[in-house]
């Protein structure tokens, strides 16, 4: 999801239908797996919350339901395409307590001290060098006693079994591409430390594994970054065709591939 920043920090993942479906799948799993942490962070009926780096808005129905008609959800993303997709989702679902605006994760345009909770999911890993500035800005948006809610991944530990050589190559190229951009592919491991450096009290720092077999329409972030990798010269169109054939091969196999991905969540409270 796009946090935004200088032009060279442009979000690398293409927002195609498969990527939108991946966001939706992640949102469904998150609501179930993180219910107690949402409550700890104050994401409950009547709360005013923000989803920063909201992407196409997959998390917005769950947040809208969590805060109820008396609450408010402020969604922000730096990518105009994602903002348009999120607004379309909000309109189609009739989410009257949700607004969507364009803004950067380190300059959201939201009023300081106006939120009970601010959520940032899978943004820090795509904004290498700006992580502390983003967390510091979001910390100013929550009222005293309010919470900042961070979610990210350890991308170096993601595995797919059974392995397929071409898809392993794709994942390794993606890791090298991210490193060359200055991104932190282990951002999830540092969430609690970033909250503490922003002056917040760390209430919870938790890890879990996603283990699942995504539907054929859902491919990993490395695939969504294929055009950016070609543009950067770390992959060719022949590579993209080879990787596409590999996905089709594993999707047609008798045993579907299983993804293992470590996810981390940290909740920090602003001192009263």
PLM region spans:
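Conserved catalytic/acceptor-binding region of the Class I
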Residues: 147-216
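A short glycine-rich, Lys/Arg-flanked "PGG" loop and its adjoining helix->strand segment in the class I
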Residues: 132-147
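A short acidic, Gly/Pro-enriched loop at the edge of an enzyme's catalytic core
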Residues: 108-117
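C-terminal helical/coil "lid" or tail adjacent to the Rossmann-like core of SAM-dependent
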Residues: 4, 9-12, 17-19, 30, ...
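Conserved alpha-helix/loop element of class I SAM-dependent methyltransferases that forms part
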Residues: 28-45, 62
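Helix-to-beta-strand junctions that scaffold the AdoMet/dcAdoMet cofactor pocket
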Residues: 68, 127-128, 142-144
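Class I SAM-dependent methyltransferase SAM/SAH-binding core
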Residues: 50-52, 56-108, 133
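A short SAM/SAH-binding and catalytic strip from SAM-dependent methyltransferases
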Residues: 116-130
């Amino acid at each position: 999801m796009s946090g935004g920043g200088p032009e060279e920090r442009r979000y690398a993942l293409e927002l195609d239908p498969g990527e939108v479906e991946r966001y939706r799948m992640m949102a469904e799993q998150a609501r179930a797996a993180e219910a107690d942490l949402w409550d700890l962070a104050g994401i409950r009926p009547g709360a005013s919350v923000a989803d920063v780096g909201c992407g196409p808005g997959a998390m917005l129905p769950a947040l809208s339901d969590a805060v109820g008609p008396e609450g408010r959800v402020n969604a922000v993303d730096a990518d105009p395409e994602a903002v348009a997709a999120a607004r379309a989702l909000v309109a189609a679902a009739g989410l009257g307590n949700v607004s969507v605006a364009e803004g950067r994760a380190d300059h959201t345009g939201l009023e300081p001290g106006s939120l009970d909770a601010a959520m940032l999911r899978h943004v820090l890993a795509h904004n290498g060098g700006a992580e502390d500035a983003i967390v510091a800005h979001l910390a100013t948006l929550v009222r005293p006693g309010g919470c900042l809610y961070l979610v990210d991944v350890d991308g170096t530990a993601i595995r797919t079994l059974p392995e397929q050589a071409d898809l392993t190559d794709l994942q390794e190229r993606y890791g090298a591409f991210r490193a060359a951009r200055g991104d932190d592919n282990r951002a999830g491991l540092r969430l609690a430390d970033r909250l503490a450096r922003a002056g917040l009290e760390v209430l919870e720092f938790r890890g879990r594994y996603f283990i699942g077999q995504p539907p054929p329409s859902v491919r990993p972030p490395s695939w969504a970054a294929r055009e950016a990798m070609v543009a950067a010269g770390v992959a060719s169109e022949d590579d993209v065709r080879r990787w596409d054939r590999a996905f089709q091969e594993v999707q047609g196999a008798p045993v579907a591939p299983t993804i293992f991905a470590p996810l981390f969540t940290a909740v920090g409270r602003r001192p009263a």
